[in-house]
Amino acid sequence: MSPSTSSKGKSSGLNQHYEEKVRPCIDLVDSLRSLGVEKDLNLPAIAVIGDQSSGKSSVLEALSGVALPRGTGIVTRCPLVLKLKKISKDNNWHQWHGLMSYRDQTKKLKDPAEIENAVLKAQTVLAGTGEGISHEMITLEIQSSDVPDLTLIDLPGIARVATGNQPKDIEKQIKDLIEKYIKRQETISLVVVPANIDIATTEALQMASKVDSTGQRTLGILTKPDLVDKGMEETVVRTVNNQVIQLKKGYMIVKCRGQQDINEKLDLVEALEKERHFFDEHAHFRSLLEEGKATIPLLAERLTKELVEHITKTLPQLQKQLEMKLEKTTEDLRALGAGVPTDEHEKNNFLIAKIRQFIDALEGIKKAEEDLRSSDMRVFTKIRKEFDRWKTVLDAKTIKTEETLRDEVEEYVGTRRGRELPGFVNYRTFENIVKKHIEELEEPALKLLKDVTDIVHSCVNRIVSSHFKAFSHLLRATKDPIEDFLDEQFQKAEEKIHSQFKMERIVYSQDHLYSNKLDTVKQNLKVLGQRPFISAEVREMAQHLTAYFMITSDHLANQVPLIVQYHILDQYISQLQNAMLAMIGRNNPGMLLQEDSDVARKRRELKERLERLKSAGKVLSKFVHSV
């Protein structure tokens, strides 16, 4: 069997095997891409990359059967999605059909000769009149009996140096665009490399290797085999046979139309015959044809097979991606809330509903029942931690008092003893020591007030922002009472704490409480330790002081938190709730509900994304149930 016969046999068998599977798989991804979900999901794709003048455009031209822009410099200035759809030969009306779309424009093409100018015009619209590039996509769909079932994404050729009107950083711009596509695990990189150069030096192969170090997603295509220097043919053969730089998907080699062929008006059909003849007659490259590694027709079959297998392989992950994006988009849209109605009556009801939701959220704080979706810990849990710290301060003070009382009492007795006989406790000394220690606790109590106020303030601000962030006027109208009422309640709580400590400096306790506590202290031999040489009067006073401080500590451990909670939580929240209810009848709903343009835009984008994802879900579901 001759090489050409062998090639035809392979083609026929492959088409029969894949005929029922190929088009639905490729149509699935094309449908998803046409819905615009490529903004949201990583779709399976084959991206064609190569250095400038690598022959990339010629390969695509040969695969599609139409002349694409070619020449020196940057020819491809935008990503070009090339959708090739094979149709039946007996349908004359659909013998050839072209459709180009970009942004919101669509153009039907009746003749293959129109394509080159149509692509150039589209690139000018998207990338400007200079030589810059754009990330915006052009889609070119071709239906013909002479094309394979295949979709490719053509990316700009890599420029090493900016020339002419090109931006100074053109190399970086192009590489960033290419990397955006090829770094995705869902993308197969089709790397086009001239056969007459050292492939290790090509930027395209280096870029592919950077994001796909094992070559799992990379297929190498060698071009321009007719330009290989004599003596280098075996190196090319070794490269195609994966013996130089190894890729899991390997290499293929093709010969496309050169400039001389174009000048001589060699059409694409004749070019394919010329290519087959070249490999058939070549002493070194004939073996590559026999092994199915050469010519455009075999490359087309290989790419179709690779794409179908890749789509099938990535489908479960695509479904998972879609579900996650749907959930996230739905949640984001819910967080933004519904848009403002246009009817004035409905607008008023909308405002009432928004304010009541806010009031309910405030009530949740007060009752320690708030929604935890926006926070990892309830406000009252944080406040309780502050109350516990206050109790720790009191306990530490009591322990410190026990340790230092001896010296303090001795100092007072030694310097301030009056006419009392030995053994009599000086009550004035007792009072002075009590007042001194009580004063030292006032500052930590005020710090507790400030810390709890900060917690409540932060929480209320977070809640008001989550409810009203879309409405700047309503947000501002709410901010004033938030600050004013909090300042008011803070001052009231502060005054009460000052008053509380003034009262604590008045030494008093119920007799039975004091006596019971004193008995406990006297029974505890650790109060003053077993320190020798301590006088009876010092021991006696120290025991009385310790007993009194324990009573005071228990009292303050509850009283200060009650003052703080009453004013900063209960009174403040209630005052704020009443002010919000009063706002309903006092203000113009239309003015309060003027929505920020950024929020409206974001809601619109989220709604559009949700619709895209839902449509994509239907397409995916239909495909899964049909196979």
From Swiss-Prot:
Which GO annotations describe the biological process of this protein?
Answer: defense response to virus; receptor internalization; synaptic vesicle budding from presynaptic endocytic zone membrane
Print the keywords alphabetically: Cytoplasm, GTP-binding, Nucleotide-binding
Q: Where is this region: G2 motif?
A: 75-77
What region holds the GED domain?
538-627
Q: Record's superkingdom?
A: Eukaryota
Subcellular locations according to the entry? Cytoplasm
Per the entry, induction is:
By interferons.
InterPro entries per UniProt? Dynamin, Dynamin_GTPase, Dynamin_GTPase_CS, Dynamin_N, Dynamin_stalk, G_DYNAMIN_dom, GED, GED_dom
Dynamin-type G domain spans which residues? Answer: 40-316
Which SUPFAM superfamilies does the UniProt entry name for this protein?
Answer: P-loop containing nucleoside triphosphate hydrolases (SSF52540)
Q: Where is this region: G4 motif?
A: 223-226
Region annotated G3 motif, chain positions: 154-157
Pfam families, per the entry: Dynamin_M, Dynamin_N, GED
The ranges of region (G1 motif) come to 50-57
Q: Which residues bind GTP?
A: 50-57, 154-158, 223-226
SMART domains for the chain: DYNc (SM00053), GED (SM00302)
**GO MF annotation list:** GTP binding; GTPase activity; microtubule binding
Give the Gene3D superfamilies listed for this entry. Answer: Dynamin, middle domain (1.20.120.1240), P-loop containing nucleotide triphosphate hydrolases (3.40.50.300)
Q: Name one GO cellular component term.
A: presynapse
Database matches in PANTHER family: DYNAMIN, INTERFERON-INDUCED GTP-BINDING PROTEIN MXC-RELATED
Which named protein is this?
Interferon-induced GTP-binding protein Mx
What broad taxonomic lineage does this protein's source fall under? Eukaryota, Metazoa, Chordata, Craniata, Vertebrata
What is the gene name?
mx
